[in-house]
Structures are given as C-alpha cells and as structure tokens.
Amino acid sequence: MTALSRVSGQAPDRVVETYAEGKPYDLFFLDVAGVRLVGRKTEAAYPGPDRDGLPAERLKCALVEARMLLGVVERDQVAEDHVAVFHRPLGEAEKAELFAAAVADPTTDLYYPYAQLGDRVRETEEGGWEVTDESARELDHAEEVLRDHVPDRLAELGFRGGVAYDAACSTGAFLQAVGRRFPGTRTIGQDLSPAMVARARTRLDEAHCGDGIRPAIPEASADLVVCRHLNAFVVGTGQAHDLLAAAASRCREGGLVVLLGHTPVLVSSQWCEMSGLTPLQRSGATPSGHALFQCYVLRKG
C-alpha cells in the first residue's frame, strides 16, 4: 500500500494561522509524487541531523524536515483575519516516504504561498542592514548549508567558472565559496549596505555598493548570477520581480541564475519560466537527506 492510499482514508483536518498573532509565512507547500503537501516550518537540526551522543543545533532557517509535514492539501481558505489549509493528515511513515521522494527529485517545488501575510517585520532598512561582527558571523553560519550545496550542484550542471555576480552579496562568503570551487572565476558582489561591502571586499575580486535594481555590471556579462535578496522580510513581491529582471539581464544566454535565501523566496518557479529562465532545480537537500530548502537553479534562454 502506498503512502497516498493510506492517507486517503483519513478524516480531514486543518491548520490555521491568524494574521495578528500567527505566522502564516511559516506554512509551506511541497509538490511531490503528484500531490501537494502542507507543512509548518519550525526549528530544524542544523547543519546536519542528530547523531548518537551528539545532538545537532536547532535553528529556524531555510531548512524543512519530514516531521514538519502535516498532510495532503485538499483546499485552502484565505479569510479576513486568518488563513486555513484543509488537509488529510499524514502518519510518520507517510511523511518519511514522501519526503524521501522529494529529496531524490531536485525539481520538487518547495514554496511558501502565504509568505507576505501576517504581522511581519521588514528587516531591510534604507541603506541596508547594520552589521556587527556577531551579526556577520550569524549570517555566515545560517548560510553554511547553502554554501556547501550550490557550488557542487553547479558543477553537476556543467558550470565551469567565468564571471560570477551576486546582486546582494552580504559578507561575500557565499560567492567566495563559488570562487574556491571554480578557480579562476571572477567574483563580483554588490550590496546596499556599505558595511557589508567593506567585508565583501576582503573576499571577492570586486564589491560594489548600490541597489540591486541598478546592477554594477554590464548586461549579459555574467556566466552565473546569484540572487539572495528576493525574499520575504527583505523586499515586497513586486520589488522581488523587478530585482530578478534586473539581475537576470546581467546573465548571458545559456548562463545560470540561482535564487535562494534564509527566508521564503517570493518569486515562483512559474514566474521564472515566464521570464525566460528554465528551472533545472527547485529545491536542494542536505547531504544526509534530513532536510530540504528552496534553491532555484535556472538556465537563461
């Protein structure tokens, strides 16, 4: 008996998040094996799973785990003060089976349909974030899984180096990891925050201070474009679409564009396709397979 046939006999349930006190932005959908699953993001084992005698750190970050899944979506309802998702509940065995299928398929779509609902705090201030040594360390730590995954995945997809541009480079650690994986790559970063740019200049070939809506490099000049600024709590959805268009214009035909981040990506893979970017990957997995995270790898043209 398959996981889905076991679930079909379950009575429906619902998960509710209010806008005033709840966190609708923590609800995620996972499209796998022809069905849509709903889950709620909580703290995950980071960067890897628990091991005997060595429990992992718990961190609320980009990672989602099988235990966070709730059920098979039947419908959702967006009301005046809350969002509700009606679903057929999953047992632990069904969660594990479907999650393993998602881990095995990088085209599995993991997304947050209510990322812009609820009482959210916009993190980005005019002129970028204030940066301290501690906050820079925290940012780099929360990005460790992404830095480990993306360069290897790029190699699997045939990337061999060239010009790599990060439209919101933060401390520069992410693009530095790409440069290390592909020697000879010219790494060019840009960030709204002068403090971030100062840190990035110690790691990258170039780092420019400025808004990503005005990219610092010429059109069609990059072999790889990284977007880590199209996320909830950072920008609005319309702004994310505009920023993607600006960044993607700097990618050459046949080049790669990567979308990811600590918080939900606001641009859908369908929007990317409509913009001339072909999805090669929609989600990434940790080496152990214990967790998934949003990670679009797109080919231009």
Swiss-Prot record:
InterPro entries cross-referenced by the UniProt entry: Methyltransf_25, SAM-dependent_MTases_sf
CDD domains, per the entry: AdoMet_MTases (cd02440)
EC number: 2.5.1.38
Gene Ontology process terms (BP): antibiotic biosynthetic process
S-S pairs: none
Top-level class of the enzyme under EC nomenclature: transferase
Catalytic function, reaction form: nocardicin G + S-adenosyl-L-methionine = isonocardicin C + S-methyl-5'-thioadenosine + H(+); nocardicin E + S-adenosyl-L-methionine = isonocardicin A + S-methyl-5'-thioadenosine + H(+)
Entry keywords, A to Z: Antibiotic biosynthesis, Transferase
A Pfam family this chain is assigned to: Methyltransf_25
Null mutant phenotype: Disruption of the gene results in complete loss of nocardicin A production.
Pathway: Antibiotic biosynthesis
Domain of life: Bacteria
Subunit structure: Monomer.
Function description: Involved in the biosynthesis of the beta-lactam antibiotic nocardicin A. In the presence of S-adenosyl-L-methionine (AdoMet), catalyzes the transfer of a 3-amino-3-carboxypropyl group from AdoMet to nocardicin G, forming isonocardicin C. Can also catalyze the transformation of nocardicin E and F to isonocardicin A and B, respectively, but in vivo substrate is probably nocardicin G.
Protein name, UniProt field: Isonocardicin synthase
Organism listed in the record: Nocardia uniformis subsp. tsuyamanensis
Lineage, highest ranks first: Bacteria, Bacillati, Actinomycetota, Actinomycetes, Mycobacteriales
